[in-house]
Every structure is written in structure tokens, then in C-alpha cells.
Amino acid sequence: MLHAVLLCPYSKLIIASLASSKAITMIKNENASCGSNIRLVVAKNYMNGSREAGDYMAKKVRMKSEAILCAATGNSPTGAYKVFVSEILSRNNPPEKIHLLKLDEWGGLDMDDPATCEDYLQKTLVRPLQIPATRYVSFQSNSRAPVAECQRVQDWLAIHGPIDLCVLGLGLNGHLGFNEPADALIAAPHVAKLTDQSLAHSMLSTTRKCPTHGLTLGMRDILASKSILLLVFGASKAKQLKRLVTGGVSSLFPASFLSLHSDVQCICDEAAAALLPQGVFQKNKD
């Protein structure tokens, strides 16, 4: 396993401004050149990376008695969630103490549609950990008032936040949740327009409906998290990971804003890391 830490001297100042300002409604295109605080861990393959990620999640959650875990969906975190559940249950850590927050959701689908993020999280985390409804905060996919639904999640975060650990995947266009590339990124939970790329996601292959919109946490919510875990696996994400590590900060690649956060762990496999510069890595002594 390989490991690297990339540093940016301005990150703490910038991230504090983004996370604490209640007046922020948009995060503008910075196009700034900056190093990164991202700790990069390269595992041999998906299985090894998932094991590393699941262990990391369990360690972070055990650090706080009532941790808020924000969970992404999709292929990238599935293996990590299995390891995480096993770790939590085997070490007698009461899962009822965990607050689970859904990162995003497909709007316009029934809640029991197998394509929803709801269905995914119920199967991978909620039911295995027996997380009670009082500790699970979920965008309702079938809400007839999606703006009010986003406000409900925002109000909950204002009272209970910030997120302790936010688990993310890296979109093919650099999106985080449904925060898609744009001239400006919305800070708060919001209704998002779905791109053609998002609508082509494999999760939707099982649905009979076409989602009409996305519901997602905003960039401020993500960046206000105490810790962030980014999972990047497979050769199809190699260009995106290279852009994240070597490129500047721009709203046209939303994931680049993670480089401004002071505690981001990125776990990837060798296939995803194939295009990274040789000088990025040094051997992990652990």
C-alpha cells in the first residue's frame, strides 16, 4: 500500500470561511492553483481498498459516541460499508448511537423503488445496523415539495451538525453528490438539475421511472464535515483522480474543493492511481 500527503497552506482559512458563513449561497469558480491536504492511500485492488476504508470508517465513528455519518451510494462504497458494518457489530459498538445522513437522492421516484439511494442505504447500512428512524435523516425521493424537503434537511443539520464523517465517491465529471460542474456551486441542500451523465448512472437501470431532479447536500455541508473519506476505484476514474491531485480548484470540477479541507482521506486502487505522477507517492510505513 502506498501513501502520500499533499499540503496547501491556505486551506484552513478558506475552509473555515466556507463552512461557517451563513450568508453563502453560492461558491464561485475560483480556478485557483493550490496543493492539497488530501491524504492519498493506494491499495492493490477494490477489495483491499474497501477493507482499508471500512476500518477507517469504524475508527472515526468510534471516536464519538453519537457520530453523524453522511453516506454516499453507488458501487464505490459498497465493499467499505460491508467491512464497516462487520467492524461495528463485532466490537460491540452500539449502532443505535449513530446518526446516518443520506448524501443525495433521485427525485421523482417512489421511496421503495430499487433504484433509489434509499433502497441502497436500507440494504447496506440501515437494516444491518438496525439504525432507528429517529437517527436516520433521509431526503424523501417522492416529496411533492422538494424545496421544503431540502430545507428540512438543512434545518436538521443546523441543529445537529456538523457531519463527523462524510463518505463520498468521485463522479466522472468531478461531481460530489448532485453538485454538478457549474460556474457556481450551491452551498446548502438543494434541488439539482440532473445531467445526462447522471441519468445514465447504473443505479437507474432497475427503475421503471425516470427521475425528474436530484436532492443533495450542498458544498458547504460537505466541506463543513469534520472528516471526509473519498473512495476512488477502477481505471475509469484514473483521469478524474489525476485531475483532483494535480489540478487547481474550480467549480467546473467540484471535487477539487476537497483539497481545501484539512482532513480528507482518499482511498483508491492501483487502477485508479495509474495516471498519477511517480513523485506523488512514498511507501507507507504502517
Regions found by a protein language model. Give the residues of each.
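Ligand-binding beta-strand-loop-alpha-helix segment within the catalytic cores
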Residues: 27-37, 95-166
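Class I SAM-dependent methyltransferase SAM-binding "motif I" and its flanking Rossmann-like core
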Residues: 173, 177-219
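A glycine- and small-aliphatic-rich helix-loop capping segment at beta-alpha/alpha-beta transitions
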Residues: 83-94, 117-119, 181-191
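Glycine-rich N-terminal segment of FAD-binding domains in flavoprotein oxidoreductases
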Residues: 63-89
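N-terminal glycine-/serine-/threonine-rich phosphate-binding loop
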Residues: 26-69
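Glycine-rich beta-strand-to-loop/alpha-helix junction loops that act as flexible
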Residues: 71-76, 168-172, 233
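ATP/nucleoside-binding phosphotransfer catalytic cores, i.e., glycine-rich phosphate-binding loops
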Residues: 220, 224-286
